[in-house]
């Protein structure tokens, strides 16, 4: 079985059906970016790169042994949409490579605990998270807006009780 961007947790029975053959493509650098909304958080956190990871699925959330991982640079010109496009094509490429490794019997398993004993989970974005905080630095506002631009909810602020949506900002 292959999973990609699936927002449900598979039951143990489902994971055991094809033993050690259920894999997931995760648009995050595991074990550091587990969970959801990874690309948003990578931008908000001003990361210089994001990862795509193909891993075995287990009962945890994005905790299985890593089969294949590739890192991609994040540029100031990037936003959520551009990272999403790169993640989709990157996941397709890495899944293909991982399946070939599995078929040939040469797939390696890297336990995530060897990289970092605990990992890190990204929280869900909630309603209200899209409101701009003007007390942040200009770099933080820049990262925030590009992290939640379309197809995300867009950054919101208010001026004289009028709502303003922001989809793009530049640091000058």
What are these regions (language model features)?
Residues 2-120:
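Donor/substrate-binding cores of folate-linked one-carbon enzymes
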Residues 116-172:
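Internal anion-binding site segments
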